[in-house]
């Protein structure tokens, strides 16, 4: 799981 708040 390599997902942070990079979708907004």
Swiss-Prot record:
Induction: Expressed in both exponential and stationary phase; expression is considerably higher during stationary phase (at protein level). This is Protein YmdG. It comes from Escherichia coli (strain K12). The gene is ymdG.
């Amino acid at each position: 799981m390599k997902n942070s708040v990079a979708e907004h």
